């Protein structure tokens, strides 16, 4: 199925989106935005086809859950900070095969994990904010893990 090409611990602060909008915070997170764009550029140069995000804002009560629908599309408003992120559109392809493979391999190792290919299961901002900048051209497929 491929190989791990790049790993990064990154920010996903909602103020990155707020930084795009007119007002007193315009440009406040430009450094982080530029960094995300650079990660996307490096991934393209390495031939990456899918970005996997471990999303700390996808809250679950048990196990690891892998959101690997065929496609993610919608308009997102943060329940946590609706004054920072509201009406943010997104549209990305998913990678159900990779998501299922991750779950299967995790279970073999004794990790409680489950893959979900559910069209109504949406992405959270811990995935959406990085994808907005790393994947603005929709080059990469997306898998989100809780």
Which sequence ranges carry the predicted segments?
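Soluble secreted/lumenal catalytic domains
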Residues: 1-146
